[in-house]
Design a protein with these regions (language model features):
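Acyltransferase donor/substrate-recognition loop-hinge adjacent to the catalytic core
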Residues: 150-229
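Active-site proximal loops enriched in glycine and acidic residues that flank catalytic Cys/His/Asp
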Residues: 258-259, 267-273, 307-313, 324, ...
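C-terminal "cap" of GNAT-fold acetyltransferases
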Residues: 175-190, 370-390
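Flexible loop/turn segments at secondary-structure boundaries
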Residues: 12, 66, 76-79, 129-131, ...
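Generic start-of-chain signal for non-secretory N-termini
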Residues: 1-29, 34, 376
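A conserved beta-strand-loop-helix scaffold within acyl/acetyltransferase catalytic domains
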Residues: 19-62, 70-80, 203, 207-310
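Acyl-donor binding region in acyl/amide transferases
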Residues: 80-164, 280-360
Length: 390
């Protein structure tokens, strides 16, 4: 086998192709967009290069066939509560079912990370935010992945654990029918807040996205700052995100809650983009964009996915979540717009979020795992600590 560092357009193209080759013949596999994967490793487009570095490798068999790939990253902004040693990341791992091949890829990433002063590696993760390509799928292979979700053959878990990776935390997805009635606590709490004029829940207007970008930043920074792992986000960053999302955004799915006009909660959902991208084989040129626009306007997508959820800490135990979710349900439940809703992942270290999922009547749909490998095997391994709520 031959390991090749990605340093050219040709090797970058091969890096993209490895995953498609490994998953060939799997009817549930949906190829990620080529440009989105490339952007992760573009120093001009990925802001994380301000805080770290990334390397990529591909693995060829002796007869020149592509049989594996891996990327490794350092990022000074990658923080986990309870971790007091430098931790790098590995991601975009794909490999044939061969432990020796997998070990060569892991060894290469480990050696590079060690040179950079890292003492452990987490993976598979992304050189970026945790909403995309984060974790290894270990349950849920019976359905296609949602947009931004990792998807891999079942044997990958064995390749990771045989090398010495351990379960750092589980990532749970939950799903439900949009048509289902919500449990009684939701309409009851909704009625309580609806009777108080100071509390308002409303969906966004696409014509006013800049205003809602500020509300998003306010809630996100307040809701997640308590955990100490999420980076603060600016209004300008959210404006950029919203502009990117606008062509496929359904304003009826993006909700905010307010108290005396101050944003205190958000419930952000979008149509599952993979229902469109599965037709594109990784491409997003002008033809695919026209097709995407057509499909998004003609009701071809019946699946929703959760993008972000948060409540400002001092309002978290009041039932604002029920108020906001019930408002959304009242609008869409009896319409023929959507059928299935699958929520974004929640870590086992965030029991409050998992309880919200369960309270909706949703059922577990998939499980991912973020693994950790300590370079010094004599060090004690500790799982991610449970979130401390403010």
């Amino acid at each position: 086998m031959h390991l090749i560092e990605v340093t050219s357009a040709d090797t970058a193209k091969d890096f993209l192709e490895v995953q498609a080759i490994i998953n060939a013949g799997n009817p549930n596999y949906i190829r990620p967009l080529n440009n989105e994967v490339n952007d992760v490793f573009d120093t001009a487009k990925n802001k994380n290069f301000k805080y770290g570095e990334a390397k990529r490798w591909i693995l060829e068999s002796d007869n020149g066939e592509l049989v594996g790939r891996i990327a490794a990253f350092t990022n000074s902004k990658y923080i986990n509560k309870g971790t007091d040693f430098k931790t790098g990341g590995v991601g975009f791992f794909d490999c044939i079912n061969d432990q020796a091949a997998a070990n060569l890829l892991f060894d290469t990433a480990k050696a590079w990370l060690s040179q950079k002063g890292m003492e452990a590696m987490d993976g598979p993760i992304n050189f970026g935010d945790r909403d995309k390509w984060w974790g290894l799928m270990v349950e849920g292979f019976d359905k296609p992945p949602m947009y931004g979700m990792s998807y891999n053959p079942e044997y990958y878990e064995t390749l990771f654990t045989n090398y010495g990776f351990q379960n750092y935390y589980n990532q749970y997805y939950y799903a439900m029918s949009v048509k289902d009635e919500l449990p009684t606590r939701f309409p009851e709490r909704h009625a309580r807040f609806a009777a108080k004029p100071d509390y308002v829940a409303k969906h966004v207007k696409l014509s006013e996205l800049e205003k809602y970008a500020g509300d998003f930043a306010t809630v996100y920074n307040a809701a997640w700052a308590q955990h100490g792992e999420a980076k603060e986000i600016t209004k300008e960053q959210v404006i950029k995100l919203f502009k990117t999302m606008k062509p496929i955004m359904d304003e009826r799915l993006v909700w905010f809650a307010y108290y005396k006009a101050e944003p205190i909660g958000m419930f952000i959902n979008i149509p599952d983009l993979n229902q469109y991208f599965k037709h594109f084989n990784g491409k997003l040129g002008w033809f695919q964009k026209l097709r995407l626009l057509y499909m998004s306007k003609t009701g071809k997508n019946k699946q929703l996915t959760g993008l972000a959820f948060g409540i400002v800490p001092k309002y978290q135990s009041l039932g604002i979540d029920s108020f906001m979710i019930q408002e959304c349900s009242l609008l869409i439940k009896d319409k023929d717009w959507y059928d299935r809703y699958e929520m974004g992942w929640a870590g086992d270290w965030n029991p409050k979020m998992l309880n919200i999922y369960k309270s909706l009547g949703a059922q577990p749909s998939r499980r991912m795992v973020t693994f950790r490998c300590l370079f010094d095997a004599s060090k004690p391994f500790e799982r991610h600590p449970e979130m401390v709520y403010g």
